[in-house]
Every structure is written in structure tokens, then in C-alpha cells.
Amino acid sequence: MDKKYEKISQDLGVTLKQIDTVLSLTAEGATIPFIARYRKDMTGSLDEVAIKAIIDLDKSLTNLNDRKEAVLAKIQEQGKLTKELEEAILAAEKLADVEELYLPYKEKRRTKATIAREAGLFPLARLILQNVTDLEKEAEKFVCEGFATGKEALAGAVDILVEALSEDVTLRAMTYQEVLRHSKLTSQVKDESLDEKQVFQIYYDFSETVGTMQGYRTLALNRGEKLGVLKVGFEHATDRILAFFAARFKVKNAYIDEVVQQSVKKKVLPAIERRIRTELTEKAEEGAIQLFSDNLRNLLLVAPLKGRVVLGFDPAFRTGAKLAVVDTTGKMLTTQVIYPVKPASARQIEEAKRDLADLIGQYGVEIIAIGNGTASRESEAFVAEVLKDFPEVSYVIVNESGASVYSASELARQEFPNLTVEKRSAISIARRLQDPLAELVKIDPKSIGVGQYQHDVSQKKLSESLDFVVDTVVNQVGVNINTASPALLSHVAGLNKTISENIVKYREEEGKITSRAQIKKVPRLGAKAFEQAAGFLRIPESSNILDNTGVHPENYVAVKELFKRLDIKDLNEEAQGKLKSLSVKEMAQELDLGPETLKDIIADLLKPGRDFRDSFDAPVLRQDVLDIKDLVVGQKLEDVVRNVVDFGAFVDIGIHEDGLIHISHMSRKFIKHPSQVVSVGDLVTVWVKKIDTEREKVNLSLLAPNETD
């Protein structure tokens, strides 16, 4: 146990006490958000990411240790466990290294070498090693069933030596390091006809040293290979590797040469190549999942546009655009279908203009949220034309990824049973603008288009990572228990799908929940669930102001005492002045609270009901459409980052296609990844660097034209 903790401490830079605290709290049923928010004084203020890293690494090391014990037991049963081997297995830091050490002792299926040994050909193999002069003649003595000639007997003896040599742990380790440092991963086009859009063109004749392979390239090669477009292989310094193996023998002869050739080319290199490909893929997946997770987090934290009446506009050509107006709380007011773009007739388009204008006037629409899917560009032009008569109304292009998935889901059917899928989608688009977090949690995170190669990675690992991000953000923001959907509530610490549905049912039957104490009356919501969830649930309707803050009920008595000592009866300006000026360290001791806990309590009391998303950039509102022909090189723009990938970032600049900032145009200093400079949702100032009107591609730069670019 101590060694495991030491390893976690070394890898993650945390103390043994922090590790023990986190794992003990987890064992008691505490959730990551709860530990991060309400046990800071115990953990040394570890955040959610650090806490999860401790839990994950502990689990990984436990699995590794379990495998080591199983392998040691198997070798011990064979009576072949030496002290050196035991030490090597116990020192192994990767599961793959344990398996490499176990390989010579692993129970094997019947191989050519096994059959040869059973036929008594091992002594002949020894003769090969002794470089006996007339091996062919000696081999005649070993003719038996299955090995009818001396030549066949020698082939069997070679098989025995090949298996033994190919399982040499030291040679395999040397080969692994050689491949890692000097070999190249290559790809050639296999069937160009399967690559109609030339997506994989740069990989038609590609090579890269294994040790410097970038993750997105690994995943691209994997996808191209899977689709049958590419043939992926390795380029080795084979002669050098063969020399490693040949040096194992004191003598040389044709049979030993054959043993070396077969061991390297048929056994060891293919196995090492498989291992390297697996490790490259795992590393690439880890990077892709982390990037997707970071992008998702930033998307979920986009500032909500509260208190606005929004019209959701789901564009389409033939079937017409679906419109939905929602009030300031997200409640649907009306839906309608219009035909604003061709192939609609001129009469239909004019009618659509009147209908949209009527909706704006009738419901006091303040913002139009246009989905960025099919017919988005044409719909944007249509909306901009109508808004010439409504200077007080703006529009926003909204990323509609996943809206269709939600609108066809059981959740959407329950919410709007009498509406078509398309109208539900328009409502979702409108609500995404009002409160991105509340709406996006209804959708499988994998359907939200802010990833890179997300379909090529482990879906289980991706889901786990994205769910963690959603859980973290939901609890950091807090949830209004009286307005939240079951989907949003289910991400609150301590709550599951059943309890979340019970909360909504309780609201429907009993009316609004008016205190945190009342939450305990919800069926199936026990003491542990209440402990974990209560601090993250907000109740604006409560007579107790603490119920609408992040202050946990376990600290209400301490806060009451704090108010008494400071003579605070209301959280007015005078009270805030007292809270700001008090000595946290001294007061924490007097109240028997941890200093970090008191700091958080004061922060909540200074801004009750705060939504920290308000400090992030809001969407860019537009009133007029921009065409690629309106752009000029060197033009300055201010727009929002839509997606971040390994090679750059895509920015919504108001035309049909997002502009690309390549990583080389992000900073005058060297950066390893675009995420060091920008995040999804960031409002950035960019300059147009290159315009390709024909392909509708725009290259951007974060560097002003007068800077070194």
C-alpha cells in the first residue's frame, strides 16, 4: 500500500496525506464534486481533476498489482521463479512490461516448437548451437513420426530455437527501444477510390519517426486503414536489430542465421509493432479525449443570455424552417413552419418574411438563434433582411450539433409529446442560447461537435471523461431545484436518474420546494444523497438566503454564529464590508471551521445566487450578414472560438465556414498545443491572413499584420 501511495505521490505531485484523505472519503461514498467543494481543508484544496487523477491512478495501480501477483503465482507453480525475475516483475510500471516478462512462462497453445519438443528434437537444436560439422547427417537420427526426413527434423529444431530466442526478455526490450527511437511509421495509399474527398491525401506517402508521432496523425492513420484507404506499416533498421539477435550466439551457421531471421521478422518485430501501435493509439486517444473534454467544458461554461425572449430557427431547404419562440424562462410560447429559402417560391418567401416579422412583434422577440446546419447560410441572409426593420433585434448562429439527437430522444418526447422532431429541435436551439448548460446536458456529450476523431477513440473512456466534465461543471455552477430538468438534476452530486425524476414529480405534486430541509422529503433521497447534493442545489424561493448559495447546510449553524458575532441581519452593503474585512484565520478558529471553508462561505455571502458563468464571454450578436467576398486580407475581426483541435482553432467569423487559426499563427513563442492560447467560447481578435473564395476557406491569425507571423 505504501509503495502504491508513493507512486501516486511521485506521479501526481500530491502528498501521502492528500492521497489517503481522498481515497478514504471516496470509500465512505463521497463524490468528487463534494470532496472538491466541501472538504478543501482536508484535501489541501485539491480540485476535481486532481481528485479524479488520484482515484484513477489508484485503480490502475491496483489492477497492475493484481496482475503481478497472478503472474508471480503462475511462475511459482512452475518452480521457475527466481529472485531476479520476481524483482523485475515487481518493478515493472506497465502492464505490457509484466506480460513481456511473463511471456517465456506463459501456458502456450500447441505451436510448431511444442510439437518439435514433444518429438524429441531438443537435442538436435543443441547440436545446431554447438555447430556440429555434419548436421544434416546427425539430423537423420532424429527422423520420427511427423518429421519424416532429416531436413524436416532440422526445421523442427530451428522452430524450437526460434521460439526460445523470440521470448528472450532482454532482446525484446532492446528491440522495443530501438523501434521506439529509430523506426518510422509509414502509410501508402491502398485504394484511392475510397477517399472521394481526398481526406487522407497527405498520408498517401507518409512516414514519421515513431517517437515523434502526433496523436491526431495516429488517429488519422488508424481511420484511413480501417476504411481501406491506407496501408500502414513500419520502416525499421532491420540489419541493426538482426545484429542484436545474432550476437546472442557464439557460433555461426546457416541454421542459426535462419533462427535469427525468423525470430526477428516473424515473431519479435510483429509483436513489437502491435504493441507500439496500441501504445500510440492509447496515447492519441488520451490526447483526443482530453481535448474533447476541455472543449466541452468551455462550451458548457459559455455565459447564458438570461432574461431574453428568443426565437429558435432550425433551417432547412425543402421541408421549411421550423421556428419556436421561448419566453425568458425557456417556456415554449409558439411554433411555426415557414419557407424562407429556395426552392420555395417568391410568394412563399415573402410570406415567410411577414410571418417572422409578426412573431417578432407579437412576442417581443429580442434575439434569433439560427442553427448552423443545412441552409444556415441562406437562412442567415433571410433573417438579416427581415431585421433591417427591427434594429433592436439581433441574431446569433448557434452550434446545433446534437439538437436533432435530443429532439428525437425519449426525454424530448416526454417534454413535448405533441410536437414534431423538427419543432423540438428549434426549441432546443433557442434554449441553448438562454442557458447552454441546462440544454446541453440533455444531449449525449459525444453528439456535441467539439471533438477531433471522437468516433475513433474508446467510446467507454470518452463517455467517462465527458460525463466527468458535465458533472464537474453542473456542480460548480449549481442547479435551481425548482426549474431544473431531470437530465440536469441527475448530474448533481449524490443524485441519480430515479431521484432526479422523483424531485420533478415531487415539485409537480407538492409545488415549489421552499427550503433545503424540504428536499429530504423527496422519495429515495436519503441522508447520504442529501449530504452530497444539498450544497449544489439552489432555492431562490427560500426564506433562508443561504439556501440560494453554495453554503452547505452542515455549516448553517456556523454562519448563524458568524452573523451574530458581526451583527449582520441582512446582506446589505454594510454587511458585505464587515465580511470583507474580517480575519479569516481567526474567525475560522472561533467558529471551528477550516479557513478554506470559511473563505468559500464568505465568497457565497458576498454574491448570493451568483452564476460564475457570467464572467465568461457571451455569444457575439449580429444584425447583418457577412459574405466571404466582404473579407480582405489584413482585416481585423472579433469573434468566438467554435472548436479547438490539435493543429489550430476554428472561429465563427460570420460566414458559412468557420475560419481557421493554424497553431503556427497563434503566438510568436513556441507552443505545444492551441489550448495553451485559446479555448472554446473565447472571444478573440483575429486578422484575416488568407482567403480562398472558391473553396470558401479563410485562414486567420492571432498576430497583427505588423507582428512577426
Summary of predicted features, one role per range:
Residues 138-150, 206, 245-264, 268, ...:
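Low-complexity, acidic/Ser/Thr- and charged residue-rich accessory regions of DNA metabolism proteins
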Residues 177-185, 313-317, 373-378, 398-405, ...:
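A glycine-rich phosphate-binding loop feature that marks nucleotide/adenosyl-phosphate handling sites
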Residues 19, 338-343, 367, 408-421, ...:
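Short beta-alpha connecting loops at secondary-structure transitions
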Residues 97, 396, 402, 407-477, ...:
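Long, charge-rich intrinsically disordered scaffolds of nucleic-acid metabolism proteins
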Residues 50-53, 60, 64-312, 316-418, ...:
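Duplex nucleic acid-engaging cores and interfaces of nucleic-acid transaction enzymes
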Residues 1-20, 27:
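Generic start-of-chain signal for non-secretory N-termini
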Residues 31-32, 43, 47-148, 476-615, ...:
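Accessory alpha-helical DNA-binding modules that contact the DNA backbone or grooves
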